[in-house]
Regions:
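Hydrophobic alpha-helical transmembrane segments in integral membrane proteins
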Residues: 46-64
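N-terminal secretory targeting and juxtamembrane "stalk" segments of secreted and cell-surface proteins
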Residues: 20-24, 33-34
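Hydrophobic alpha-helical membrane-insertion segments
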Residues: 25-27, 43, 58
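Membrane-embedded alpha-helical segments of integral membrane proteins
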Residues: 1-21
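Membrane-water interface of alpha-helical transmembrane segments
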Residues: 3-6, 27-33
């Protein structure tokens, strides 16, 4: 809409130029007016291009349909003589009859086309039963969601699974999920955003585990943001689990809406929007901003990336990613990692509202496009940006991490083997609810 107004303005000024030239018979006053008008046209053309760039960037991350990719693979044992999909004609191939069944069937159809007929298949109830069958060579190959390789390695006795297999075929199965326009139902004065960081590089649309799970509770009137961090191993239920508890990080394997459902259930709160990015997008955004200044309350090193000192640290994208991912350097492990992740989010918010970024908007937009996904409408984004430009007051940002007790349990995603989980601390969860409601009701 702003672009249309500017284009109309350009047309009007062009008409004024011709009228002015005719009326003045090319005398100096007319020429001077024409020069001024041409200068105005140049400025407005730049404005059109800038706004179009904003429009294109915003549209790229706020599509009406969200693309979700599932990277499906065919794997065999490392020492197998099978090297290609065409070698599978005489072999028994395993697959799991689970949430990925539609994607598995598409891969099986590709196998059938490759071997020139119907191959031999055996269905399993879960990934671990299928892996056991591959190990004892009941089956010779398996159709698998690649994201589940890391899940399998979390199981006791399966830690070296990836080193025992080789992938002979891979294909991305693409689904399009309709994004509901929430611009009319949400209140931009107060809202909750789910920030999801998935554990992959490359294409942000690939479904994977969500290792960063932060709720940002925002009050745009009082300029207050409350960050609530939930550890990746929190033992929770989610919409897909039918009441069976699972790791919070595994909820992301079934889509971002599933992660949102888990947190809404845990904290009794409605999540209005989500922002989802992976490692690559995280690095791109921070580098586009010229880096961020992050406060560290610990002195530690992440080899070979950087040594972090107590106090302010200016970090590039890869340095910020290493800071946010590290947990082995701390006695508190994942809890400290969550605290550091919120420090990074705080630094990003502060940088995004700085004059340095506003003056460098073009480069920022180049870095943002395609780096993340969100269901926030372009109208809501424009409204928030406009309000921040009018009132450039800094936000007060508070953070809180819920904790729990570590234990070994079976989960919805890992029903046949035990894995480390964190049983939620009820008092912490209740305090987080109070903090959330404190912002929404203040």
């Amino acid at each position: 809409l702003p672009s249309k107004f500017l284009i109309v303005g350009i047309v009007v000024i062009v008409v004024v130029i011709f009228i002015d030239l005719i009326a003045a018979r090319k005398l100096w006053p007319g020429i001077l007016t024409s020069i001024i008008s041409i200068a105005l046209i140049a400025v407005m053309i730049v404005g059109v291009l800038a706004i179009n760039k904003v429009d294109n960037t915003v549209d790229k991350v706020t599509d009406k349909e969200r693309e979700e990719k599932t990277e499906m693979v065919i794997a065999v044992l490392k020492d197998s003589q099978t090297e290609d999909i065409s070698d599978l004609s005489e072999l028994l191939i395993g697959y799991v009859n689970d949430d990925d069944i539609d994607s598995s069937k598409k891969i099986m159809s590709e196998i059938d086309n490759s071997v020139g007929g119907s191959a031999n298949y055996n269905a399993f109830d879960d990934n671990f039963a299928m892996v056991d069958a591959l190990y004892n060579q009941t089956i010779k190959a398996m159709v698998l969601n690649k994201a589940n390789i890391s899940v399998i390695e979390e199981g006791e006795g399966y830690e070296d699974f990836e080193s025992k297999i080789k992938i002979i075929y891979s294909n991305d199965i693409v689904n399009y999920i309709k994004v509901v326009d929430k611009s009319q139902e949400n209140n931009l004065d107060k809202f909750v955003v789910y920030i999801s960081g998935i554990d992959t590089f490359g294409d942000v649309s690939v479904r994977s585990r969500s290792d960063v799970n932060i709720l940002a509770v925002v009050d745009t009137k009082t300029k207050h943001i409350q960050l609530i961090n939930t550890p990746r191993d929190y033992y929770v239920t989610h919409p897909k689990s039918n009441g069976v508890k699972d790791k919070l990080t595994h909820a992301g394997l079934y889509g971002v809406d599933n992660s949102i459902g888990a947190l809404e259930s845990l904290y009794d709160v409605k999540v209005n929007y989500y922002v989802r990015m992976n490692f690559s997008g995280f690095e791109q955004i921070i580098d586009a901003m010229g880096g961020i200044d992050v406060y560290s309350d610990k002195d530690f090193t992440v080899e070979p990336v950087k040594h972090y000192t107590v106090g302010e640290n200016h970090l590039s994208g890869i340095e910020a990613l290493a800071f946010a991912r590290e947990r082995h350097a701390f006695a508190a492990g994942d809890i400290q990692r969550g605290e550091n992740q919120m420090k990074v989010v705080t630094a990003m918010i502060n940088k995004l509202s700085s004059k340095e970024v506003l003056y460098n908007y073009s480069k920022i937009l180049d870095g943002v496009a395609g780096a993340f996904q969100t269901d926030m409408s372009s109208e809501d984004i424009y409204s928030l940006v406009k309000n921040q430009l009018v009132d450039n007051t800094s936000y007060t940002i508070d953070s809180y991490t819920v904790t729990g007790e570590g234990k070994s349990c079976t989960t919805y995603s890992m029903p046949r083997t035990r894995a480390y989980v964190m049983e939620p601390n009820v008092n912490d969860v209740n305090h987080a609810k109070e903090l959330i409601n404190g912002v929404l009701n203040e």
